Swiss-Prot record:
SUPFAM superfamilies: Nucleotidylyl transferase (SSF52374). One of its GO terms (biological process) is coenzyme A biosynthetic process. The gene is coaD. The keyword Transcription regulation does not apply. This is Phosphopantetheine adenylyltransferase. Keywords: ATP-binding, Coenzyme A biosynthesis, Cytoplasm, Magnesium, Nucleotide-binding, Nucleotidyltransferase, Transferase. Belongs to the bacterial CoaD family. Pathway: Cofactor biosynthesis; coenzyme A biosynthesis; CoA from (R)-pantothenate: step 4/5. It comes from Shewanella loihica (strain ATCC BAA-1088 / PV-4). GO terms for cellular component: cytoplasm. Its cofactor is Mg(2+). Reversibly transfers an adenylyl group from ATP to 4'-phosphopantetheine, yielding dephospho-CoA (dPCoA) and pyrophosphate. GO terms for molecular function: ATP binding; pantetheine-phosphate adenylyltransferase activity. Its EC number is 2.7.7.3. It catalyses: (R)-4'-phosphopantetheine + ATP + H(+) = 3'-dephospho-CoA + diphosphate.
Amino acid sequence: MHTKAIYPGTFDPVTNGHTDLIERAAKLFKQVVIGIAANPSKQPRFSLEERVKLVKRVTEHLDNVEVVGFSGLLVDFAKEQNASVLVRGLRAVSDFEYEFQLANMNRRLSADLESVFLTPAEENSFISSTLVKEVALHGGDVSQFVHEEVAKALQKKD
């Protein structure tokens, strides 16, 4: 049995869709590490430190979840964490092609690393960090898409 999984992402910001997947992964695995990628090429709205803090806040009710920022290759981070599974979310069929390519590349780089795909609950299937940021940027109410702390943090950024 795989006991430790990594759910990687930029989480800029963490959404209810992410939280849904984290909660379900926490039921499937003994330990889940949320790996927050530095990913400066995406020009994140929140710093790595801010994203780590927000994800810790929204996952504090989960005893078997740890939140860690990282840079570099995901497969190297997985090895450092002694994790054998990557958890990835699929919102729509359109996500599958990219995720399939990514899973195959990760398998080539680290043969023992398996990818597991989870789909969000229907009410979260359309939520993306990009859409949430866009709505918030134009003064829209994002409270139904993100944790209260995340909504407040987005308001402060505007």
